[in-house]
A protein has these predicted regions:
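N-terminal acidic, glycine/proline-rich low-complexity segments
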Residues: 1-308
């Protein structure tokens, strides 16, 4: 890929683009919103498939269990949206994290990503939107680096802002090796940092009640699941909840910077000590530095309310 084409692919695409979503959908509440937002945006997004990513926290007993639960949650969301025709396009991903920076974990998900990438080109790339540990995507790169670097654009919600004190963010620290592969391989790469940038994308129970509660089965599920998660730690208290993952889908819809602002920087280097290193000689990546919270939620809520 030429440098000119790389820089072009770091810009928000125009028209309808092919997208694969890689998601740890059972992790918390935000993945469900992102899946819904993606499927409710056919004017810009042609969904080729969804891949389940591993995760391990209080909602899973292991990374493998997290992936399996995420796979099931994706199917549940498709059922709520009456989109069961996509069930055959949902793929199980890695059952753990990369053992090192050279060994892929070959799964249905990583094989699917590579196979679809081969059908695309630098001029008409495949967009891989990742909103969990980026294990499946890094595995695809290790399996066929040339195809992935030339024919895809990777959009990732992960890491923290480059001036944040550390990078110990859930999606990144689970699989630092995978993050280092993606940041370092030369693929057109868009980072939406969590703390310091996307952390602005919060909502509340009263706001969800006003805008989406009672409008559909899906909307009620999103509302109830969000309140249920918040009640675990803040029942009877004031709370807000960041809907992180919606931002990665919103980047694809970001005409004229209506949802966020970004600029190219030399690709950051995630380190195993939870910091970034910087090398000005590195290839460019797209770094999102500002989120327009009201605009994103306005579009998301309108699509949820108008869902047929």
């Amino acid at each position: 890929m030429t440098q000119e084409q790389l820089l072009k692919n770091l810009q928000v695409p125009s028209g309808i683009v092919d997208v694969i979503l890689d998601t740890d959908a059972y992790n918390e509440t935000d993945d469900q919103y992102a899946i819904a937002y993606m499927l409710l945006s056919p004017e810009r997004i042609n969904v080729l498939g969804l891949c389940a990513a591993p995760f391990h926290n209080a909602n899973s007993s292991s990374p493998e269990d997290g992936m399996v639960r995420s796979y099931d949650e994706i199917l549940h969301l498709l059922d709520l949206m009456d989109r069961n025709e996509l069930a055959t396009k949902v793929y199980r991903g890695a059952r753990g994290y990369l053992p090192d920076e050279n060994t892929p974990i070959e799964t249905d998900a990583s094989k699917f990503i590579v196979a679809e990438a081969k059908k695309h080109s630098p001029e008409h790339p495949l967009y891989v939107v990742a909103i969990g540990a980026i294990t499946n995507v890094a595995s695809a790169i290790l399996m066929d680096r040339e195809t992935m670097v030339n024919n895809t654009v990777i959009v990732w919600l992960g890491g923290h802002a480059k001036d944040y004190p550390h990078t110990r963010e859930f999606n990144m620290y689970q699989d630092i090796a995978a993050a280092r592969i993606v940041f370092g391989c030369g693929v057109p790469f868009v980072q939406l940092p969590c703390r310091g940038v996307v952390s602005h994308l919060t909502t509340t129970g009263p706001e969800l009640t006003y805008w989406i509660k009672g409008t559909s089965k899906l909307a009620d599920y999103l509302y109830e699941h969000t309140v249920w998660e918040a009640d675990k730690y803040a029942k009877g208290k004031v709370w807000n909840r960041c809907i992180w993952d919606v931002s990665a889908v919103a980047w694809l819809l970001n005409d004229n910077d209506r949802f966020m602002s970004s600029y190219p920087i030399p690709a950051l280097i995630p380190q195993y000590d939870n910091t970034y290193s910087v090398d000005p000689r590195r290839h460019p990546m797209c770094y999102v530095y500002e989120i327009k919270r009201d605009a994103i939620f306005g579009d998301l809520f309108a699509k949820l309310r108008n869902m047929k």
